[in-house]
């Protein structure tokens, strides 16, 4: 897979006033329209499951001219501009904003759909975000300022493409490691283990049923990444859940997806 591993100087983080973290901080720069970014989200979900006590992931919509132009071209107003919508969602919590962008990618990437106001509303509510507060926040000029801050961060870290991950240890005097492009899962776990500098224990993933209920829409590739089961075994378990009317299979141009028919698990 294409990509670049590059050491960065630590000044990129020191120049930015961000809350400190106790262990490893990962900056994830993404393009909401990129299929590689969509694939990386499965890897990040697995990292968060297995290494939750050791890492903190911060998602930043890559505010490059190319990405922002695509966001503008897909929109008719601030309401359906996904860049501004993501920044407004962040005001109600980063985890909810991440959930929102994941739901949006589930809509626009496999279906190749155009972004609409109703799509934004559905994903906002499904992410546990207050819709009325979100609408008010969309009118605030500070969203544009927030995008400018993200642009500053991206420039300081010399981000040239999405997806890109930047790993920092808890020592601000240590250099960061930038990974551009998409790599196999073990590359990211190797980096985490090297930065920790000691043996660390991994957490087990939740039950398959629970994970699909949390995510609502998942790809086969995502589930294979999370669970590392043989594809034949995974298909067998998915068929069991389908027979129980807990999930259903959907076919899209970019492949098959599995959708939860179970009640949504509310975001905290």
Swiss-Prot record:
Primary location recorded for the protein, binned into one broad class: cytoplasm
Keyword Cytoplasm (UniProt): yes
Annotated function: Adapter protein required for efficient degradation of Spx by ClpXP under non-stress conditions. Interaction with Spx stabilizes Spx and exposes the C-terminus of Spx for recognition and proteolysis by ClpXP.
Domain of life according to the entry: Bacteria
InterPro entries: Adapter_SpxH (IPR046404), Thioredoxin-like_sf (IPR036249)
Subcellular location(s) per record: Cytoplasm
Keywords: Cytoplasm
Protein name: ClpXP adapter protein SpxH
Family that this chain belongs to: Belongs to the SpxH family.
This protein's GO CC annotations: cytoplasm
Assembly and oligomerization: Interacts with Spx.
The keyword Thylakoid belongs to this UniProt entry's keyword annotation: no
Pfam families: Thioredoxin_5
């Amino acid at each position: 897979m294409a990509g670049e591993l590059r050491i960065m100087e630590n000044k990129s983080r020191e120049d930015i006033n961000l809350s400190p973290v106790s262990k490893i901080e990962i900056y994830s720069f993404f393009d909401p329209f990129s299929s590689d970014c969509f694939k990386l989200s499965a890897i990040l979900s697995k990292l968060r499951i297995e290494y939750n006590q050791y890492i903190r992931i911060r998602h930043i919509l890559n505010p490059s001219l190319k990405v922002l132009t695509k966001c503008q071209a897909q929109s008719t107003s601030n309401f359906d501009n996904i860049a501004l919508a993501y920044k407004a969602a962040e005001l109600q919590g980063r985890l909810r904003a991440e959930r929102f962008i994941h739901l949006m990618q589930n809509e626009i990437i496999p279906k190749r759909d155009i972004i609409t106001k109703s799509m934004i509303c559905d994903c906002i509510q499904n992410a546990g975000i207050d819709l009325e507060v979100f609408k008010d926040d969309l009118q605030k000029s500070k969203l544009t300022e927030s995008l400018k801050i993200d642009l500053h961060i991206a420039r300081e870290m010399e981000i040239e493409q999405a997806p890109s991950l930047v790993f920092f240890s808890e020592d601000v005097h240590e250099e960061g490691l930038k990974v551009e492009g998409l790599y196999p899962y073990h590359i990211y776990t190797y980096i985490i283990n090297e930065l920790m500098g000691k043996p660390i224990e991994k957490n087990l993933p939740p039950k398959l049923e629970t994970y699909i209920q949390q995510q609502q829409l998942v790809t086969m590739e995502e589930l294979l990444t999370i669970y590392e089961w043989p594809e034949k075994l995974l298909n067998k378990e998915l068929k069991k859940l389908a027979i129980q009317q807990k999930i259903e299979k959907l076919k899209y141009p970019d492949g098959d997806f599995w959708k939860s028919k179970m009640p949504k698990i509310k975001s905290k």
